[in-house]
């Protein structure tokens, strides 16, 4: 007896056929004369019926949920259809039933989603410990199958566009890329280490030097950094690189690719082209370089209105950002939003309610001298609440931008659909206050804007990068740039970052030498596939779209990793554990 059909694939067209099915018992019901079994496989479930006269009846009496069985029977119309199931108009009258494996009772239910009912969530730690059971749930299987469709759509599209898939090494050299490396000791020479790649950045650029022209890879990457909802120590990205291109070429191709992915994987049509904002404009209007465009609530710069106001907090601030909310907020709500602002380095959150003919509450008395101009600038109306953050330009924007997001929750604003945008014209460098040095916004291989090259040493903070981020619903899902292909320019950028010639040779010598053999202009991008899939599925965490993820501490409750290793193995590697 071999399987002839998936249980979830049976329809009215199969009525009258004898079928053999294999899968798990989702639920068992004994009605005193008939026994009903719901048989589940990856395609769904179908109802099986065992009559007392059937040879299958004795086995049906003893099976329990999650047992693995093989069933044989005749497909017939179901007397009472179940509209919640795709197979709800048919059932299988059993002639044979064989137990392939018995099962313990799972520590949490896995059956509800397959019946079209709401799934009850167990604790995440329990789900991760028994991940193989968690993956039996319908939603989790749908997430993994969507992941498959997305990757297949990427492959199909890029293959048609002339891209070549190339695997790059997992064991490579430790180079500074912004996060800590995972190190792998080299057994043959204690004291030497490989590093797991944080990205295939240098290898894909060298593939362009090699003349491959168009490369892509579904790449595994590793970063030893603090974890949060959208981070894992090991993660997956779509990595691609193109030769002889400018910014427009990369953006246009990626828009078409993303539209293809959403069409094939979700049946959703994305409007093209995606809107674009400069980094400066995104920060000014939304207080974020990854703004959520699914709702309005734009920030307004109102500092100039208060230059002669006498309200010193606003008068002396570099920037005063204002946000009009279409609600008269309570003091409790204002206090909650003020805490958000303070967490983002603001000194406080000023506020006032807009009334007919004036303001009330908070800093109302300081606003009266500029009332007309302020209402015009913020487009506030009676019944609204005005919120203000004053301070350094970046702090004011970032803090009120964070308030904007929390306010959208308080107001119950709808955040539906998929709103993409490109953020472009990033600064090449930013000043690190703690280190008192310039550091890169993206990575040190990003090309400066050609128009800004004269400023590189004179005024580095004003140099724009040929860099771009792809943002979806307020989340960065991709980032890339045109790369530096001139070894002399690359050396200049390294020097600006405080990387001297000796350190350049030690850490990047192989790459700088490659550039000296004729590198084409090139650029590319990397998508965070896990983040993208979490957004496509409406999941709260990327752990929901990864088969076997780590928990928030970077540990695996299923396998117990990371775990101690024998002393003998450490000695072989020339290692000794020193506990802090």
Swiss-Prot record:
Pfam families: GAD, tRNA-synt_2, tRNA_anti-codon. InterPro entries: Aa-tRNA-synt_II, aa-tRNA-synth_II, aa-tRNA-synth_II/BPL/LPL, Asp-tRNA-ligase_1, Asp-tRNA-ligase_1_N, Asp/Asn-tRNA-synth_IIb, AspRS_core, GAD-like_sf. PANTHER family: ASPARTATE--TRNA LIGASE, MITOCHONDRIAL (PTHR22594:SF5), ASPARTYL/LYSYL-TRNA SYNTHETASE (PTHR22594). SUPFAM superfamilies: Class II aaRS and biotin synthetases (SSF55681), GAD domain-like (SSF55261), Nucleic acid-binding proteins (SSF50249). It is found in: Cytoplasm. It is an enzyme of class 6 (ligase). It catalyses: tRNA(Asp) + L-aspartate + ATP = L-aspartyl-tRNA(Asp) + AMP + diphosphate. Gene3D superfamilies: Bira Bifunctional Protein, Domain 2 (3.30.930.10), GAD-like domain (3.30.1360.30), Nucleic acid-binding proteins (2.40.50.140). Homodimer. ATP binds at residues 223-225, 232, 476, 528-531. L-aspartate binds at residues 177, 223, 442, 483. The keyword NAD does not apply. PROSITE patterns: AA_TRNA_LIGASE_II. Keywords: Aminoacyl-tRNA synthetase, ATP-binding, Cytoplasm, Ligase, Nucleotide-binding, Protein biosynthesis. Its EC number is 6.1.1.12. Induction: Constitutively expressed in a constant ratio along the growth of the bacterium. Residues 201-204 are annotated as: Aspartate. Belongs to the class-II aminoacyl-tRNA synthetase family. Type 1 subfamily. GO terms for biological process: aspartyl-tRNA aminoacylation. This is Aspartate--tRNA(Asp) ligase. It comes from Thermus thermophilus (strain ATCC 27634 / DSM 579 / HB8). GO terms for cellular component: cytoplasm.
């Amino acid at each position: 007896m071999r399987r002839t059909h998936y249980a979830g694939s049976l329809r009215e067209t199969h009525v009258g056929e004898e079928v053999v099915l294999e899968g798990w018992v989702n639920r068992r019901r004994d009605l005193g004369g008939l026994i009903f079994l719901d048989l589940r496989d990856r395609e769904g479930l179908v109802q099986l019926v065992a009559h007392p006269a059937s040879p299958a009846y004795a086995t049906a009496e003893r099976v329990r949920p999650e047992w693995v069985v093989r069933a044989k029977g005749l497909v017939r119309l179901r007397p009472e259809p179940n509209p919640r199931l795709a197979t709800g108009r048919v059932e299988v009258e059993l002639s044979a039933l064989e137990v392939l494996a018995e099962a313990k009772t799972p520590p949490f239910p896995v059956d509800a989603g397959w019946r079209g009912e709401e799934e009850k969530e167990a604790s995440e730690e329990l789900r991760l410990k028994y991940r193989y059971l968690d993956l039996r749930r319908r939603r989790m299987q749908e997430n993994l199958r969507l992941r498959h469709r997305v990757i297949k759509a990427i492959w199909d599209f890029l293959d048609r566009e002339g891209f070549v898939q190339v695997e790059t090494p997992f064991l490579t050299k430790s180079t500074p890329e912004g996060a800590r490396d995972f190190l792998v000791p080299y057994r043959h020479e204690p004291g030497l280490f490989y590093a797991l790649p944080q990205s295939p950045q240098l290898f894909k650029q060298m593939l362009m030097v090699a003349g491959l022209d168009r490369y892509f890879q579904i790449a595994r990457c590793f970063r030893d950094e603090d974890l949060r909802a959208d981070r894992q120590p090991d993660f997956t990205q779509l990595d691609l690189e193109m030769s002889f291109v400018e910014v427009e070429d990369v953006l246009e191709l990626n828009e078409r690719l993303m539209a293809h992915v959403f069409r094939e994987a979700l049946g959703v049509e994305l409007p093209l082209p995606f809107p674009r904002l400069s980094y400066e404009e995104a920060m000014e209007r939304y207080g974020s370089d990854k703004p959520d465009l699914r709702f309005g609530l734009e920030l307004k710069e109102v500092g100039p209105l208060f230059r002669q106001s006498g309200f010193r907090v606003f008068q002396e601030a570099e920037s005063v950002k204002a946000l009009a909310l279409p609600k008269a907020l309570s003091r409790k709500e204002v206090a909650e939003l003020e805490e958000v602002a303070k967490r983002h380095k603001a000194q406080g959150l000023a506020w006032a309610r807009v009334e007919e003919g004036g303001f009330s509450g908070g800093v109302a008395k300081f606003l009266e001298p500029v009332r007309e101009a302020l209402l015009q600038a913020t487009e506030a109306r009676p019944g609204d609440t005005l919120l203000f953050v004053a301070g350094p330009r970046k702090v004011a924007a970032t803090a009120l931008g964070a308030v904007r997001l929390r306010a959208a929750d308080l107001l119950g604003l709808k955040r539906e659909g998929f709103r993409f945008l490109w953020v472009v014209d990033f600064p090449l460098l930013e000043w690190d206050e703690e280190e008192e040095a310039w550091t890169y916004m993206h990575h040190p291989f990003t090309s400066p804007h050609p128009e800004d090259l004269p400023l590189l040493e004179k005024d580095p903070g004003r140099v724009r990068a040929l860099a771009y981020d792809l943002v979806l619903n307020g989340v960065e899902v991709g980032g890339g740039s045109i790369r530096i292909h001139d070894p002399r320019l690359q050396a200049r950028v390294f020097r600006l970052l405080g990387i001297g010639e000796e350190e350049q040779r030690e850490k990047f010598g192989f790459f700088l030498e490659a550039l000296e053999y004729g590198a084409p202009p090139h650029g590319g991008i990397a998508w965070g596939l896990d983040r993208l899939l979490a957004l496509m599925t409406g999941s709260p965490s990327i752990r929901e779209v990864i088969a076997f993820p780590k928990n928030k501490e970077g540990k695996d409750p299923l396998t117990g990793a990371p775990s101690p290793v024998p002393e003998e193995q450490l000695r072989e590697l020339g290692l000794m554990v020193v506990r802090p």
